[in-house]
Amino acid sequence: MSNKVHLGHTARKRFGQNFLTDENVINRIVGAISPDNEHVMVEIGPGLAALTEPVASGIDKLTVVELDKDLVERLKTHPTLKDKLEIHQGDALNFDFKQLVREDMQMKVFGNLPYNISTPLMFHLFEFAQYIENMHFMLQKEVVLRLSASPGTKAYGRLTVMAQYHCQVMPVLEVPPGCFTPPPKVDSAVVRLVPYKTKPFPCKDVEVLRHLTTTAFNMRRKTLRNNLKHMLSDDEFAQLEIDSTLRPEQISVQQYVAMANLFIDKQTKS
């Protein structure tokens, strides 16, 4: 049998499907998720239910978002899950997660995410951070390193800044390729993201922060002065006590927020 087939389902490359099969890893992830009935439990990409089954076993209801129609049909007829699941068939990248929030109940979101959509999905989920208690995701190890990176490192970038603006980021465990069917070509890791109830460095307009960080990191080898010359002047960098000759990966989240807020203030006055 092909190593792309697991439980009778052939992994689809276009959906980035790699199914988690290692029981020890599954148990550790479920322990980190800590399922309960006090939150709206949401799984993205349940696949063949490796996490779905143990999470659902201890709670009354689990909401899942799955793109693959064949997998949705399997879940609808699953002997132990079908009565516990609220199934949404569709693309998580376009899904309105706010609709899942119930009165006085925030979401706990988790999943073994398709690696080909993990970065855009992170940005999409950050839009709903105020409704989320925490998130646990299996990702490429490289993406987890980017999420948790410090300024001055190669992994530090736009994703780092936006993730750490919205959330505390904590790597949980590393997972080798042999824990999956089919084995991915890269190492994986689980990360815990806890959205801030109160932002340590509040930005007046998050869209401006996103635009500024995207602009800054578009050319990593260039200086801030070069990359942000259409947004901030040398005098404004001096006002913020930021060295404009530094490269974008040398600037902290707090400094990016300060630059965005100054730019917003300038636009408001003009």
UniProtKB/Swiss-Prot annotation:
Domain of life: Bacteria
Location relative to the cell: Cytoplasm
Keywords noted in UniProt: Cytoplasm, Methyltransferase, RNA-binding, rRNA processing, S-adenosyl-L-methionine, Transferase
EC number: 2.1.1.182
Residues bound to S-adenosyl-L-methionine: 18, 20, 45, 66, 91, 112
GO terms for cellular component: cytosol
Family membership: Belongs to the class I-like SAM-binding methyltransferase superfamily. rRNA adenine N(6)-methyltransferase family. RsmA subfamily.
Protein name: Ribosomal RNA small subunit methyltransferase A
Species of origin: Shewanella piezotolerans (strain WP3 / JCM 13877)
Gene designation per UniProt: rsmA
